[in-house]
């Protein structure tokens, strides 16, 4: 990830338009900003969300609210609570997200 030609700025995430992305179950609401090749998102997963695909994109992710369970293709599962994060490189380890009955809110950079 190269951060170049990004002037100092601030984001009021409540002003960023949200888009809905359906999961296998539930949905995700994304508020997205693009800074050159860097995508920055505030994502709210609905209760009982399950991603509809195995993701191979790299991310740095921080849980802000709720619980996020990340399942890796090799069978490992990790549950993150608010204040916890993970990082994974592009094409390193396929993974998918799910939430429990409370949903989750995340900050993601990729």
Where are these regions (language model features)?
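Short beta-strand His + acidic residue motifs that chelate non-heme Fe in jelly-roll/DSBH
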Residues: 52-53, 70-71, 88-89, 93-101
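Short acidic-glycine-tyrosine-enriched beta hairpin
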Residues: 74-91
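Conserved short histidine dyad/triad with adjacent acidic residue
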Residues: 36-55, 89-92
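A short hydrophobic beta-strand segment most commonly corresponding to one strand
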Residues: 85-88, 101-110
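A short, N-terminal "cap"/entry segment at the start of jelly-roll beta-barrel domains
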Residues: 1-41
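Short, conserved beta-strand element in jelly-roll/cupin
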Residues: 45, 54-70
